Amino acid sequence: KDSGLFVISGATGSGKSTTLYAILDAINKMYKKNIITLEDPIEINKDYCLQIEIDDRKGISYHESLKQILRHDPDVIMVGEVRDEKTAQLALTCALTGHLVLTTIHASNCINTIKRLENLNISSLDLEDVLLGIMTQKMRFNDKKEVFILSEYIDQKNLLKYFDRKKIDYYDFSKAACTLKNVGVLNEK
């Protein structure tokens, strides 16, 4: 999709940013889009995009930076984290005006992600218009101390069912893991 909002949720340390970078890598490899990221801090340097580090102490906020980057006519905007109402509203506006916006938010599951966005005064009608998908991640370790990711995912079709108050289908871990393998987040082990 060329425009809309894709959200990855989970707790601190669940790999949300790593997944966002893998998605950006895939977009860059397949489509060569103008990508701008807003991050606090920049976690992985990427040479194919403009990365802006957020520093609220210096007055460089997500909200102000989002307003400024629109002058660069980005195709894809990564907002490292939606933390407040202003950032949520501006990310929504960017998605509504033809940009692809990728972001993270702290929420325990996909449905709670929608509720968090609504608590930031994003209407369910606006979410219905722009949400492309929601993925929630939980990082776990097995008995050998190897990391694996548990994910749930709701695609756009099922999000529309949710907003129409119909039964929705979650993608189980195996489907989400296949997607993550394709974008380079999980190896073949």
Positions of PLM-derived features:
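Short, flexible helix-loop junctions that flank or precede catalytic/ligand sites
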Residues: K1-K189
